[in-house]
């Protein structure tokens, strides 16, 4: 499935739900649009940066109206390191999204019949508990979010 670079701005889009990999989603003209760092209920302007046959990927250009559930990220590295993609989401909503993701992957993607999936067991520690790092290597310089790659 090939991806094409596009430059499309979708304005005043309501974020509908959480998706896999810490992203959220909305729909535009029947196409699913995945957006990192968004919270269900946010109204945002989205810059579409990649387009594939069945979905678009975008980034938040502007938060028009934040969701009532949106939290201020607590980590100074939020949005850069990739470790805590759901920081703006309250912890209970993170747990609910993770349970829904498991169910979705088993039922919708795996075509399995499963019993009711119990709630995700919460951690006593809800900050600084991650033990995963994501490293990216390249022979090219790292670009920050506000830099133009062209």
Task: List the predicted regions and their residue ranges.
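SAM-dependent transferase fold signal centered on methyltransferase-like domains
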Residues: 1-150
